[in-house]
């Protein structure tokens, strides 16, 4: 009963026979009675009336992989055998025959007429944006109220293979203590200007903390500004005693300067030297090398300094210029000839005639009486 009902339901089903062949697809044969794969093909023009559940189904062909020996010896059939190692001649590449692009070919990749620009790490400062101006050496600008414009108040530097942090907020008013003064001679021989008048006052409550961070700032600035040989111009004029750096601070600066910087220092010019700075250098002789002492020069005026170095990019503080003007004025006044003052004589004493000692001639009678 169930088989008859299933047969009636399948009478209206259109069943098409599919060819499952591993070969390339080809059109189905139109003629009946053609043997394919060794068996007669039935005419499929009319749909079948029954389903053949017990008939033989056509099977797919199964490809058998060849036996491959995966051993590492060069036996027959292994991966290292000569059959697998042989390659066609056209795949052999000679490395020496490969052409490498030259500099002209490399420039072809630059479009829109842009030229290749070479950049180096050499610090070049201009007079418009010198270190110590509104933009400091590290590019960390701060606002007038002391807050950082870019949110950074600290700068990490490496000095002597050790990492240090600089409190930029505390040393912001004193960053002009070290500036770049251009170059001298041929090459990149830098002029580093150290203005002592911008040092902090020793009466400040955080004086030692400020000097500690300012010391790191000065040393890291030398590392940043110096490319080859350099000289330091120390502006000592217009600096009161309370702003003078101590001997310990100067000694620490000298000891932590890299050996390359100490070797490349060609001259230390001290402008307007005072007795205090001379005394400090005299006391510092035990821990300062003789070569460093020989590099020190004393200059007593800016005019003399101009004879030694170019002054186009050297920034002289206003207080130093005023100090120089006062010194020149005092020098001119001291060189001016003074008028001679003659004391007036109130009473003239009468001249006294000299007394002549004239002896009277002795007569013969007087000689006789004396005898």
UniProtKB/Swiss-Prot annotation:
Principal place of residence: other
GO biological process: apoptotic process; mitochondrion distribution; negative regulation of glutamate metabolic process; neuron projection development; protein localization to synapse; regulation of protein localization
Region described as Mediates interaction with GLS: spans on this chain: 190-371
Pfam families membership: BNIP2, CRAL_TRIO_2
Biased composition (Basic and acidic residues): 11-29
Compartments (UniProt record): Cell projection, Axon; Cell projection, Dendrite; Presynapse; Mitochondrion
Positions of the record's site feature: Cleavage: 105-106
Post-translational modification: Cleaved by CASP3 and CASP7. The potential C-terminal product released by CASP3 cleavage may inhibit the ERK signaling pathway through MAP2K2.
Residue span of region Disordered: 1-54, 331-371
SUPFAM superfamilies membership: CRAL/TRIO domain
Region (Required for interaction with KLC1): 115-120
Record bears the keyword Mitochondrion: yes
GO cellular component: axon; cytoplasm; dendrite; growth cone; mitochondrial membrane; neuron projection; presynapse; synapse
Residue span, CRAL-TRIO domain: 171-328
Bias (Polar residues) ranges: 42-53
Keyword line: Cell projection, Cytoplasm, Mitochondrion, Neurogenesis, Synapse, Transport, Ubl conjugation
Cross-referenced InterPro entries: Bcl2-/adenovirus-E1B, CRAL-TRIO_dom, CRAL-TRIO_dom_sf
Primary role: Functions in the development of neural tissues, particularly the postnatal maturation of the cerebellar cortex. May play a role in neurotransmission through regulation of glutaminase/GLS, an enzyme responsible for the production in neurons of the glutamate neurotransmitter. Alternatively, may regulate the localization of mitochondria within axons and dendrites.
Subunit structure, as described in the record: Interacts with KLC1; may link mitochondria to KLC1 and regulate mitochondria localization into neuron projections. Interacts with GLS; the interaction is direct and may control GLS localization, negatively regulating its activity. Interacts with PIN1 (via WW domain); upon NGF stimulation. The interaction with PIN1 and GLS is competitive.
Domains: entry comment: The CRAL-TRIO domain is known to bind small hydrophobic molecules.
Protein name as catalogued: Caytaxin
Source organism of the structure: Macaca fascicularis
């Amino acid at each position: 009963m169930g088989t008859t009902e299933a047969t009636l339901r399948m009478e209206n089903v259109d069943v098409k026979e599919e060819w499952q062949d591993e070969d390339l697809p080809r059109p189905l044969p139109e003629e009946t009675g053609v043997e394919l794969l060794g068996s007669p093909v039935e005419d499929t023009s009319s749909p079948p009336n029954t389903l053949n559940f017990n008939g033989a189904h056509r099977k797919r062909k199964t490809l058998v992989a060849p036996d491959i020996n995966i051993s590492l010896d060069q036996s027959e059939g292994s991966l290292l055998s000569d059959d697998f190692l042989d390659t066609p001649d056209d795949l052999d590449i000679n490395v020496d025959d490969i052409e490498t692009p030259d500099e002209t070919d490399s420039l072809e990749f630059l479009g829109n007429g842009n030229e290749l620009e070479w950049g180096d790490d050499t610090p070049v400062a201009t007079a418009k944006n010198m270190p110590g101006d509104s933009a400091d050496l590290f590019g960390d600008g701060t606002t007038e109220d002391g807050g950082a414009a870019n949110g950074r108040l600290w700068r990490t530097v490496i000095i002597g293979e050790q990492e240090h942090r600089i409190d930029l907020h505390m040393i912001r008013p004193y960053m002009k203590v070290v500036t770049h003064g251009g170059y001298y001679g041929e090459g990149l021989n830098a002029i580093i200007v150290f203005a002592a008048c911008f040092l902090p006052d020793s009466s400040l409550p955080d004086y030692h903390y400020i000097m500690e961070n300012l010391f790191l700032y000065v040393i890291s600035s030398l590392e940043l500004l110096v490319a080859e040989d350099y000289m330091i111009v120390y502006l000592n004029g217009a600096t009161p005693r309370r702003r003078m750096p101590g001997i310990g601070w100067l000694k620490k600066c000298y000891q932590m300067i890299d050996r390359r910087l100490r070797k490349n220092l060609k001259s230390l010019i001290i402008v307007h030297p005072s007795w205090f700075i001379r005394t400090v250098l005299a006391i510092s002789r035990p821990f300062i090398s003789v070569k460093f002492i020989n590099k020190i020069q004393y200059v007593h005026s800016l005019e003399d300094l101009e004879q030694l170095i170019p002054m186009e990019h050297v920034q002289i503080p206003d207080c130093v210029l005023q100090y120089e003007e006062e010194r020149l004025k005092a020098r001119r006044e001291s060189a001016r000839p003074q008028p001679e003052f003659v004391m007036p004589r109130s009473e003239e004493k009468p001249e006294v005639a000299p007394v002549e000692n004239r002896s009277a001639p002795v007569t013969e009678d007087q000689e006789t009486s004396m005898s």
